[in-house]
């Protein structure tokens, strides 16, 4: 009998972090209950069908597929038997106000031709930048990812002071790191916008975030066949096969405590579920406020883990095709510094935002009726700020600015061709997922506030309470929150020993 068999684990929240934790713990022999307040698993990886269109409501990009594969192989399964993924090419298409269009491509020769549009020597600079990005990634994978390092002191202990200083470019911002190698302003902007993965500003995030381009080029950029939600369905199926009990439409209202430990979770319907270990996929600060009723002194310690940005999310079904689009597209601001400062410093809506646009029908036409396509639009905007409240009219005005900008940059008569629409503001995101102040990516990466670290996975209040998801290390995005579930299993097993 496995020594973990009698350990009852309750996982709160069935986002990818919660699903990953449940699977990893069940594989290690724990008895696991997974409690989800919504009517389906997946968290922000969500799906909606409307008027013949199938919308992926959450993440649109899959990278680092080996992290997902590890969940399945750890359980003696093959991921390909549960879900199919395919590479997306080009990675991104980048549109600028002057009419320039630059693709990011996996194939080196194609990438050279694209970057040659920006002038001689640009590709050589890009290659030197990728070498720098690779070094950052290699060092990060060795400790932060592989060992689950959970903060600055863990990092210093593992790498040592000198290696930490030399390996992670600690005195520069992401933007400064890019500009060490890249002189063309368009390529600077493209590389800076890899920060979209973690919902932060390249001017405030540490240079370590420059590992993101190498991750994308090395591991590829992928799509889940049939829609991104298929990954959540595959993980749900695996969890059930491993004996995880999943309760949907069940909201946790309290984590009950005794002698410095979590002893049970209480549901909104009054049910009390005893637990030996609790794992929360609810973000750390909302969980401390809502489930733990943490004292002000504990909450104050968490202030440096400020929420990431949010987004105005437009899911459009249009009755025509836009052949100039790739699967993933960026329409850049003419004033990138002003855009990021608006979002992250003054907490207002940008006058000229950079826009991320996903056209999944380029890879998967079956997601829309014949002759139609899906266009998902996501400009980054501030998280909810109680001191600078934005109104429905403010969000509506931004929607109009965004659509006008896209029409000006080539999406002719876009507004006239919208036949169905789903429109989310930070208020909707907060209400649906209980994310901290409506943030999308968990905790902001800011070298002055938190050195780019997220909150620790172990609770500082209760010895058997752990956290997973985008608000804790290693951070936001599909692969990182999935990795967090695997790392928390390792911490729990180590703590029990």
Curated annotation (Swiss-Prot):
Keywords: Carotenoid biosynthesis, FAD, Flavoprotein, Oxidoreductase. One of its GO terms (molecular function) is oxidoreductase activity. NCBIfam families: crtI_fam. Its EC number is 1.14.99.44, 1.14.99.-. Disruption phenotype: Cells lacking this gene accumulate the fully unsaturated C30 carotenoid backbone 4,4'-diapolycopene with some additional less unsaturated intermediates. The keyword Oxidoreductase applies. InterPro entries: Amino_oxidase, Carotenoid/retinoid_OxRdtase, FAD/NAD-bd_sf. Pfam families: Amino_oxidase. It catalyses: all-trans-4,4'-diapolycopene + 4 AH2 + 4 O2 = all-trans-4,4'-diapolycopene-4,4'-dial + 4 A + 6 H2O; all-trans-4,4'-diaponeurosporene + 2 AH2 + 2 O2 = 4,4'-diaponeurosporenal + 2 A + 3 H2O. It comes from the Bacteria. This is 4,4'-diapolycopene oxygenase. Belongs to the carotenoid/retinoid oxidoreductase family. PANTHER family: 4,4'-DIAPONEUROSPORENE OXYGENASE, PHYTOENE DESATURASE. GO terms for biological process: carotenoid biosynthetic process. Pathway: Carotenoid biosynthesis. CrtNb is not a carotenoid desaturase, in spite of its apparent sequence homology. Its cofactor is FAD. It is an enzyme of class 1 (oxidoreductase). Involved in the biosynthesis of C30 carotenoids. Catalyzes the oxidation of the terminal methyl side groups of 4,4'-diapolycopene to yield 4,4'-diapolycopen-4,4'-dial via the aldehyde intermediate 4,4'-diapolycopen-al. Also able to catalyze the oxidation of the terminal methyl side group of 4,4'-diaponeurosporene to form 4,4'-diaponeurosporen-4-al. It has moderate to low activity on the C40 substrates neurosporene and lycopene, and has no detectable activity on zeta-carotene or beta-carotene. Gene3D superfamilies: FAD/NAD(P)-binding domain. The gene is crtNb. The keyword Flavoprotein applies.
């Amino acid at each position: 009998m496995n020594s973990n068999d009698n350990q009852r684990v309750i996982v709160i929240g069935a986002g990818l972090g919660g699903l990953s934790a449940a699977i990893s713990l069940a594989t290690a022999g724990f008895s696991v209950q997974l409690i989800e307040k919504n009517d389906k698993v997946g968290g922000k990886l969500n799906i909606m069908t409307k008027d013949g269109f199938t919308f992926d409501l959450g993440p649109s990009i899959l990278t680092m597929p080996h992290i997902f594969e590890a969940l399945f192989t750890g359980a003696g399964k093959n991921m390909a038997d549960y879900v199919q993924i395919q590479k997306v090419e080009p990675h991104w298409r980048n549109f600028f106000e002057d009419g320039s269009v630059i693709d990011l491509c996996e194939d080196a020769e194609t990438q050279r031709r694209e970057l040659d549009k920006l002038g001689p020597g640009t590709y050589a600079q890009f290659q030197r930048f990728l070498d720098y990005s690779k070094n950052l990634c290699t060092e990060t994978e060795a400790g932060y990812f592989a060992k689950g390092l959970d903060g600055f002191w863990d990092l210093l202990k593992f790498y040592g002071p000198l290696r930490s200083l030399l390996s992670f470019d600690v005195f520069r911002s992401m933007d400064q790191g890019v500009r060490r190698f890249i002189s063309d302003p368009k390529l600077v902007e493209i590389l800076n916008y890899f920060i979209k993965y973690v919902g932060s500003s390249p001017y405030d995030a540490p240079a370590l975030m420059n590992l993101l381009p190498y991750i994308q080029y090395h591991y590829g950029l992928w799509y889940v066949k049939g829609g991104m939600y298929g990954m959540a369905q595959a993980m749900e199926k695996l969890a059930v096969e491993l004996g995880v009990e999943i309760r949907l439409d069940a909201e946790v209202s309290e984590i009950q405590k005794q002698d410095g430990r979590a002893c049970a979770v209480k549901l909104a319907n009054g049910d009390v579920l005893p637990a030996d270990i609790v794992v929360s996929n609810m973000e750390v600060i909302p969980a401390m406020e809502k489930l733990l009723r943490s004292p002000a002194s504990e909450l104050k310690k968490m202030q440096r883990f400020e929420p990431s940005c949010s987004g105005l999310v437009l899911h459009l079904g249009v009755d025509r095709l836009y052949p100039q689009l790739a699967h993933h597209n960026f329409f850049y601001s003419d004033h990138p510094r002003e855009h990021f400062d608006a979002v992250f410093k003054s907490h207002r809506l940008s006058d000229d935002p950079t826009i991320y646009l996903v056209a999944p029908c380029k890879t998967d036409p079956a997601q829309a009726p014949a002759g139609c396509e899906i266009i998902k639009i996501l400009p980054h905007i501030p998280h909810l700020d109680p001191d600078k409240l934005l109104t429905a009219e403010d969000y509506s005005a931004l929607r109009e600015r965004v659509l006008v900008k896209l029409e000006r940059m080539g999406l002719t008569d876009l507004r006239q061709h919208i036949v169905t629409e789903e429109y989310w503001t930070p208020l909707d995101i907060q209400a649906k997922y209980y994310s901290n102040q409506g943030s999308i990516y968990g905790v902001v990466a800011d070298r002055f506030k938190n050195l780019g670290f997220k909150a620790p996975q172990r609770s500082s209040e209760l010895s058997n309470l752990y956290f997973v998801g985008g608000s804790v290390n290693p951070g936001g995005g599909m692969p990182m929150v999935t990795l967090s579930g695997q790392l928390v299993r390792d911490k729990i097993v180590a703590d029990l020993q």
